[in-house]
């Protein structure tokens, strides 16, 4: 329901949230099984609105909490950038993001001057100047990073557009540099 809620359509948002809640309770055996959501902003909204029995995880938490000790990480001599989304920071997951990236890369850059990408849900599609303004300090603070990672596809689009490097899901980093 987040897409509807952010546009002011509260009734539709509540209806979609209820539909999602019912579907996830069924799929997770009433919360017994964990659920992975690939977008950190969506997950934050889900945690705020859905049944508390649901064990909801975003990619960083899921990999860190469930897979980190089961995988063998190969640390490569690369510098990667990570971006902690606003929702990642609100959920307190930013340290896990940096640590997870550090298991795969010799150097991790997380520009302190960039606290929000400025994409603002879907507004970056319509107002790219919001994104450009939010990321004004990104490019000069990448310090040799050749690839970037985050946990929100829309943020990653804007980060890629404004950085000169490609940003993608942290899942790609973990999959690329691990084995069982």
Model-derived segments and spans:
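Iron-sulfur cluster-binding electron-transfer modules in prokaryotic oxidoreductases
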Residues: 1-180
């Amino acid at each position: 329901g987040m897409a509807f809620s952010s546009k002011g359509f509260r009734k539709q948002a509540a209806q979609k949230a209820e539909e999602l809640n019912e579907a996830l309770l069924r799929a997770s055996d009433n919360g017994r099984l964990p659920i992975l959501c690939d977008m950190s902003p969506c997950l934050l909204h889900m945690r705020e609105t859905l049944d508390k029995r649901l064990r909801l995880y975003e990619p960083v938490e899921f990999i860190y909490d469930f897979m980190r000790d089961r995988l063998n990480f190969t640390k490569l001599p690369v510098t990667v950038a990570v971006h902690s989304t606003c929702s990642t920071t609100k959920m307190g997951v930013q340290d896990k993001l940096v640590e997870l990236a550090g298991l795969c890369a010799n150097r991790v850059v997380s520009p302190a001057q960039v606290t929000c990408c400025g994409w603002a849900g879907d507004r970056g599609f319509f107002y790219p100047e919001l994104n450009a303004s939010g990321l004004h300090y990104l490019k000069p603070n990448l310090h040799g990073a050749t690839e970037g990672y985050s946990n929100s596809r829309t943020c990653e689009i804007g980060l890629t557009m404004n950085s000169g490097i490609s940003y993608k899901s942290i899942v790609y980093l973990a999959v690329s540099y691990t084995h069982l």
